[in-house]
């Protein structure tokens, strides 16, 4: 595939992936407008993996992991970063070839570079999800994750959904041949180069300070409890509302992550909180499946 985008910029790199996967039949959807720890939390992955309805999509997802912040001092550890998520349901038999084709679209020559699939089964305890998977290494560095979902929200995936997750910054650093994420060229236009650091370095410094030092522990504990109660209430309605309930799951999960960054939760409590999120996610998954079933699984027609 030829592309008109400059893959030596972060902007062009993302646009190339979007164009490639659009040509493979994916709906290019937009990022979720909430704090999530990974692209898997997006409803297009978590909820659309449930039930028999086919769906292929791809999207960029800003992801937040408060404990990974380093005050902007580490060249490759960030509390806010980007994933590119591809969801293929049912999973095609040539998923590996499609992925390699995306690397070629980004200018990675398979005859020159060493691409390896290293077995690494995936699990998300908070989402009650797991799958058979592989890390994808490019010249010895992990750049993507490849997963065949077996279970989501405690429900078996029929058919199996295939997921590809690209670590955008890490792969872009390789393509641009830079050692620091802040040295990535975001775009190069009439006003000159705009660097990743120009856009995000101050955010990393300030958000790390907030996550580790100023996030109000009492507020976050209350937020978690309030979200849990709201989720339970929405699922207990005569006609449950799984989509709004799922938003409460994501809010509770982020509150938990902030409490984790503040070291406000003991090891024992940590497992209890993870179980509480998983219980919410399982309730949402069951309600969503039942709602789609009541509609007659319309996308199967």
From Swiss-Prot:
Gene: glyQ
Enzyme class: ligase
Disulphides: none
Alphabetized UniProt keyword annotations: Aminoacyl-tRNA synthetase, ATP-binding, Cytoplasm, Ligase, Nucleotide-binding, Protein biosynthesis
Location of this chain's protein in the cell: Cytoplasm
Entry protein name: Glycine--tRNA ligase alpha subunit
Pfam families in the record: tRNA-synt_2e (PF02091)
Main subcellular location: cytoplasm
Record-linked InterPro entries: aa-tRNA-synth_II/BPL/LPL, Gly-tRNA-synth_heterodimer, Gly-tRNA_ligase_asu
One GO CC term, this protein: cytosol
Molecular function per GO: ATP binding; glycine-tRNA ligase activity
Family affiliation: Belongs to the class-II aminoacyl-tRNA synthetase family.
Assembly information from the UniProt record: Tetramer of two alpha and two beta subunits.
Matching SUPFAM superfamilies: Class II aaRS and biotin synthetases (SSF55681)
Reactions catalysed, as given in the entry: tRNA(Gly) + glycine + ATP = glycyl-tRNA(Gly) + AMP + diphosphate
Residues in the signal sequence: none
UniProt-listed Enzyme Commission number(s): 6.1.1.14
NCBIfam families per UniProt: glyQ, PRK09348.1
GO BP field: glycyl-tRNA aminoacylation
Superkingdom field: Bacteria
């Amino acid at each position: 595939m030829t592309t008109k985008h400059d893959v030596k910029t972060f902007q062009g790199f993302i646009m190339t992936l979007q164009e490639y996967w659009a040509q493979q039949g994916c709906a290019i959807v937009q990022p979720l407008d909430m704090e999530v720890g990974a692209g898997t939390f997006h409803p297009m992955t978590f909820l659309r993996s449930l039930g028999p309805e086919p769906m292929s999509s791809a999207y960029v997802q800003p992801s937040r992991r408060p404990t990974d912040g380093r005050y902007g001092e580490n060249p490759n550890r960030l509390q806010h970063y980007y994933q590119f998520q591809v969801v293929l349901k049912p999973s095609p038999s040539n998923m590996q070839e499609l992925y390699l084709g995306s690397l070629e679209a980004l200018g990675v020559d398979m005859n020159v570079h060493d691409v390896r699939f290293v077995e690494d089964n995936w699990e998300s305890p908070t989402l009650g999800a797991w799958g058979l998977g592989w890390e994808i290494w490019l010249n010895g560095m992990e750049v993507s994750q490849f997963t065949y979902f077996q279970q989501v929200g405690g429900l078996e995936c029929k058919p199996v959904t295939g997921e590809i997750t690209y670590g955008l910054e890490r792969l872009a650093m390789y393509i641009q041949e830079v050692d620091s994420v802040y040295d990535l060229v975001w775009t190069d236009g009439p006003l000159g180069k705009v660097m990743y650091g120009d856009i995000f370095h101050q955010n990393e410094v300030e958000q790390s300070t907030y996550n580790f030092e100023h996030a109000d522990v009492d507020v976050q504990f209350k937020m978690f409890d309030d979200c849990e109660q709201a989720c339970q209430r929405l699922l207990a309605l005569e006609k449950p509302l799984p989509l709004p309930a799922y938003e409460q799951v994501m809010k509770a999960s982020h509150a938990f992550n902030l409490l984790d960054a503040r070291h406000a939760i003991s090891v024992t409590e940590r497992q209890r909180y993870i179980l509480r999120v998983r219980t919410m996610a399982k309730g949402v998954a069951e309600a969503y499946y039942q709602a789609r079933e009541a509609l007659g699984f319309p996308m199967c027609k």
